[in-house]
Amino acid sequence: MSRLVIVSNRVPVPDKGGIAPAGGLAVALKVALEEQGGGIWMGWSGKSSGEDEPAPLAQLQQGNITYALTDLTDTDVEEYYHGFANRVLWPICHYRLDLAEYGRKEMAGYFRVNRFFAHRLAPLVKPDDVIWVHDYPLIPLAAELRQMGLENRIGFFLHIPWPPADVLFTMPVHEEIMRGLSHYDVVGFQTDHDLENFASCLRREGIGDALGGGRLSAYGRIFKGGVYAIGIETAAFAEFAKKASTNSTVKKARESIERRSLIIGVDRLDYSKGLTQRIEAFERFILANPAQRGRVTYLQITPKSRSEVPEYEAMQRTVAEQAGRVNGALGAVDWVPMRYINRSVGRRVLAGLYRLGKVGLVTPLRDGKNLVAKEYVAAQDPDDPGVLVLSRFAGAARELQGALLVNPYDIEGTANAMARSLSMPLEERQERWTTMMDQLLEHDVSRWCRDFLNDLTASSDRCG
């Protein structure tokens, strides 16, 4: 079996006990390495300095996984990560042209850091290694590795949406981005819609096309484009939730909710998540259903994210102020309608909180997949499952047929879905939950990993 080398922007470094920070992508990639019998996971350490040259690559061995960590300079972080990756690629891929900020310095920094990553990675790679690169910060990495002479099989998976041509082409370096993807042997997307958008971009620009059989051509190269819907550790997460009832934090939450119905939302603080629209919909739901006053609690867990980017800092203030306004307008001495937590919660505790939720609110304006939706479903009690209210613009909506799909821009429609969820008969809730749970058990994170790597190792057409 070929050794697997994973490259991602950040690497979740295990602590002394071997426990890595929890998160959807982190968990998925660790499972991928474990199922391949180990390998290398390389990426940014999260550390930076004002030095012109970062410290040498650090390697940490945990079991059969080698974590290869590189520092970056302060300039690198600002231009590559906070700059081009998160002020250009992220908003463009989430259809937010109004938030994209183009700068030549940031664009140059993005490609420079990818070249730096390639130079740090290349000495670690053996001829028969399979390299799996993840997400938008590292799109040009394969091109840099090919330039250095590496002929390994290299795959890329995009965790966020791929936009339509008319959106992508507003980006000055869109052709360089598409050229970068053509250097991979397999390019994976979350949904068929994303793959169709990518193929359309190739055609519209006159640089390639879909050849059939999952093959794409671009810049004289042939590579595979595929859809690989990322999953979760379904069975394990369900067990977390089942056992979490004895957790002290979960117990306190259950006691504080008392007999009220819990509506729960869990999202990073990001403008793509539709948080302001969701809070407005909750307010509309209470105003339209006065009998629910004092009988429902909305818990929104929203860890801080990318605070160095001005748009995120501004949004943090906006969401906190909106939550305060709703509580001030609707609350009573003995009832706080909305609880807003602006920090991370441990994964096992989160599983228990999901299980308490009668309604799971997952209403992003645009999302590649959204693993929170899948975790909420997996955490439910089969005898009394909650209802998932899911944005039609989340990639997960194409898989979770038992959810109540909503348009997050339709405030009244989302409010109505909350009301319907809380009044839904048990039999219908169980039927919807069973449909979704069966899907999640069949298409879990192991299946995602296996499908992608099987296609990558079977690929016969190399880039270069």
Swiss-Prot record:
This is Trehalose-6-phosphate synthase. InterPro entries: Glyco_trans_20, Trehalose_OtsA. One of its GO terms (molecular function) is alpha,alpha-trehalose-phosphate synthase (UDP-forming) activity. It catalyses: D-glucose 6-phosphate + UDP-alpha-D-glucose = alpha,alpha-trehalose 6-phosphate + UDP + H(+). D-glucose 6-phosphate binds at R10, Y81, D135, R306. Belongs to the glycosyltransferase 20 family. One of its GO terms (biological process) is trehalose biosynthetic process. Pathway: Glycan biosynthesis; trehalose biosynthesis. UDP-alpha-D-glucose binds at G23, G24, R268, K273, L371, V372, A373, K374, E375. Homotetramer. The record marks W90, I160 as: Involved in alpha anomer selectivity. CDD domains: GT20_TPS. Keywords: Glycosyltransferase, Plasmid, Transferase. Its EC number is 2.4.1.15. It comes from Sinorhizobium fredii (strain NBRC 101917 / NGR234). Probably involved in the osmoprotection via the biosynthesis of trehalose. Catalyzes the transfer of glucose from UDP-alpha-D-glucose (UDP-Glc) to D-glucose 6-phosphate (Glc-6-P) to form trehalose-6-phosphate. Acts with retention of the anomeric configuration of the UDP-sugar donor.
